[in-house]
Amino acid sequence: MLYNLLLPHIHNSHIANLFHYITFRSGLAIIITLSLSFIMGPILIKFLRSLQKNGQPIRSDGPESHQTKAGTPTMGGIMIILSSGLSTLLLADLTNQYIWITLFGFISFGIIGFMDDYAKVTKNNHYGVRGKSKLVLQGIISLIICVLLEYLDKNPSHLLNVPFFKNLNLDLGYFYIVFAIFVIVGSSNAVNLTDGLDGLATVPIAFTAGSFALISYLVGNLIYSHYLQLTYIPNTGELTVLCAGLVGSCLGFLWFNAQPAEVFMGDTGSLSLGGVLGIISVITKHEIVLAIVGGLFVIETASVILQVYYFKATQGKRIFKMAPLHHHFEKHGWAESKVVIRFWIISVIFALIGLSSLKLR
């Protein structure tokens, strides 16, 4: 909004001219989202506590230490959606179609998560909305997004860029739409599975969003994309502002979510954040890089899939003491804070590997 209002005055004012730069607006987005989070946090937490008598239901079969979390309110993802959404509307170019498509997906996945959190709180159990129902809703939203991208792009590309290999692109044809839906839905649920400990998912999400802030900027810049031999996609640079807002929102939320958490992001936050990262990876054509940068999410998801299939195949045997993987280490006696910090370190490594693919070809 500010960018669009100040655009006519860019050449007449030094201050207005600053808003012409994506980097300036991205830095400002981090500051604004952090500030909004600090302001909204105490108010939202107090409000959620007044509505949720028992807070988020805690699994009885989980680590014993988790029983101390009883009464902690959920739906804290509302804070993330509001702060990053407002900063994007304030600082991004609102004539950019990618901004609106991404915000649509972000909010839509947030609504699905809110429905799930609401069901858990009102029914006082950890099941919420049926898994199949959530998958169907996620699939429908992802399909709408993919169709919009196909329709709005004059020359839609169905190429899958393979990182670390020079000029290796796989033409998936119209199967790419199915693949893109899988990426978006998979990303949403992978982040959701990772969000099981205080602060565990928040920092890796921030690292992933920060990585895609850089990717969006490079892919949307003709000179940099040509130099790095990346597929140039006009107008994706504005997504840098949105990604920067996500980084600030996650850091602001971590202030209240660090152990012992005052609030959980819930599915409202995890589904929306995972979904928006998937959408941005599809728009920027860096779907495989998302799997690398967000490698922690992939590992957590794989641990659940392996556990379920092995349990069924062996009629009751388990690979891990408990899935997702972070609970396995808790069952081994690791303190929650140790699991969280070590997983953060792993996410940093994955982010660096993913970003190195931009140059190593």
UniProtKB/Swiss-Prot annotation:
One of its GO terms (biological process) is regulation of cell shape. Signal peptide: none annotated. GO terms for molecular function: metal ion binding; phospho-N-acetylmuramoyl-pentapeptide-transferase activity; UDP-N-acetylmuramoyl-L-alanyl-D-glutamyl-meso-2,6-diaminopimelyl-D-alanyl-D-alanine:undecaprenyl-phosphate transferase activity. Its cofactor is Mg(2+). It comes from Rickettsia akari (strain Hartford). Pathway: Cell wall biogenesis; peptidoglycan biosynthesis. This is Phospho-N-acetylmuramoyl-pentapeptide-transferase. Its EC number is 2.7.8.13. GO terms for cellular component: plasma membrane. InterPro entries: Glycosyl_transferase_4, PNAcMuramoyl-5peptid_Trfase, PNAcMuramoyl-5peptid_Trfase_CS. Belongs to the glycosyltransferase 4 family. MraY subfamily. Its main location: membrane. It holds the Pfam family Glycos_transf_4. It is a multi-pass membrane protein. The chain crosses the membrane at residues 28-48, 74-94, 99-119, 133-153, 168-188, 203-223, 236-256, 263-283, 288-308, 338-358. It is an enzyme of class 2 (transferase). It catalyses: UDP-N-acetyl-alpha-D-muramoyl-L-alanyl-gamma-D-glutamyl-meso-2,6-diaminopimeloyl-D-alanyl-D-alanine + di-trans,octa-cis-undecaprenyl phosphate = di-trans,octa-cis-undecaprenyl diphospho-N-acetyl-alpha-D-muramoyl-L-alanyl-D-glutamyl-meso-2,6-diaminopimeloyl-D-alanyl-D-alanine + UMP.
